[in-house]
């Protein structure tokens, strides 16, 4: 039980900006085991967003959507948005070359492509949030962060790590591969408790995952921390839009 709690705390510290403080730096093995808790972190983010949405009942939907999106970004510290920005720049600037793409991803500067992609993704999220809130469907909000963070263990389990060294490789090398399929099956299966909306969100998540993974493999031969972050952001966006349509 103590080890499970520590894994959750490691996952929360890594994926969110919640005030989680550990007594010591996690080991690579602990970072690897923490991947089991990524779906739960998504659930917790979703619960916070739902609670915030309910507390803002009566607020105009556009303002409510803007406040919720701001909270959403703050909860993750824009961690995944940073990965999306890096991947967008690298995918265009890399011109199809693996080494050039990886080099651009390491550049901390953001180019115009990154800015445009971030604006478009945030605009789509905002619009979808406003639509869902206007339809009285705030209860569906947890599906987006939940399924997006459930896709991370699936990515690490099925896709080699493309860049040697770093935290990403340590996580990939210490994945609890025997336990992950059960956790993923349970996480994806529980999404069906949301009925047809859950089924739609799950199908969108899996189809987008399959397509993005194929692009990662074709360009890089694997995944990186940036592409994993992009997967989270694009999955959240796609699920929200699908539910709002």
Curated annotation (Swiss-Prot):
Subcellular location: Cell inner membrane
Protein name (database record): Adenosylcobinamide-GDP ribazoletransferase
GO MF annotations, alphabetized: adenosylcobinamide-GDP ribazoletransferase activity; cobalamin 5'-phosphate synthase activity
InterPro entries recorded: CobS (IPR003805)
Organism: Pseudomonas aeruginosa (strain UCBPP-PA14)
Enzyme Commission designation: 2.7.8.26
Any one Gene Ontology BP term: cobalamin biosynthetic process
Membrane-spanning intervals of the chain: 31-51, 61-81, 113-133, 138-158, 192-212
Pathway: Cofactor biosynthesis; adenosylcobalamin biosynthesis; adenosylcobalamin from cob(II)yrinate a,c-diamide: step 7/7
UniProt function note: Joins adenosylcobinamide-GDP and alpha-ribazole to generate adenosylcobalamin (Ado-cobalamin). Also synthesizes adenosylcobalamin 5'-phosphate from adenosylcobinamide-GDP and alpha-ribazole 5'-phosphate.
Enzyme superclass (EC): transferase
Catalytic activity as recorded in UniProt: alpha-ribazole + adenosylcob(III)inamide-GDP = adenosylcob(III)alamin + GMP + H(+); alpha-ribazole 5'-phosphate + adenosylcob(III)inamide-GDP = adenosylcob(III)alamin 5'-phosphate + GMP + H(+)
HAMAP family: CobS
Transmembrane helix listed as a keyword: yes
A Pfam cross-reference name: CobS
One Gene Ontology CC term in the entry: plasma membrane
Cofactor: Mg(2+)
Similarity annotation: Belongs to the CobS family.
Bilayer topology term: Multi-pass membrane protein
Coiled coil regions in record: none
């Amino acid at each position: 039980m103590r080890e499970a709690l520590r894994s959750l705390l490691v996952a929360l510290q890594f994926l969110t900006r919640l005030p989680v403080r550990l007594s010591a730096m996690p080991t690579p093995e602990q970072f690897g085991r923490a991947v089991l808790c990524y779906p739960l972190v998504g659930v917790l983010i979703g619960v916070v967003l739902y609670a915030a949405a309910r507390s803002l009942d009566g607020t105009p939907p556009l303002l409510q959507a803007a406040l919720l999106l701001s909270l959403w970004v703050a909860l993750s510290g824009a961690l995944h948005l940073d990965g999306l920005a890096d991947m967008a720049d690298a995918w265009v600037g890399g011109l199809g070359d693996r080494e050039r793409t990886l080099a651009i991803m390491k550049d901390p500067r953001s180019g115009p492509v990154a800015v445009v992609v971030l604006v478009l993704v945030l605009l789509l999220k905002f619009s979808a949030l406003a639509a869902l809130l206007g339809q009285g469907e705030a209860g569906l909000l947890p599906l987006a962060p939940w399924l997006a963070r459930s896709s991370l263990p699936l990515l690490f389990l099925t896709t080699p790590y493309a860049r040697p060294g770093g935290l990403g490789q340590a996580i990939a090398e210490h994945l609890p591969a025997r336990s992950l399929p059960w956790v993923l099956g349970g996480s994806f299966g529980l999404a069906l408790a949301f009925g047809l909306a859950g089924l739609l969100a799950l199908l969108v998540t899996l189809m987008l995952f399959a397509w993005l993974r194929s692009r990662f493999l074709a360009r890089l031969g694997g995944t990186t921390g940036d592409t994993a972050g992009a997967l989270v952001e694009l999955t959240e966006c796609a699920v929200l839009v699908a539910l709002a349509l």
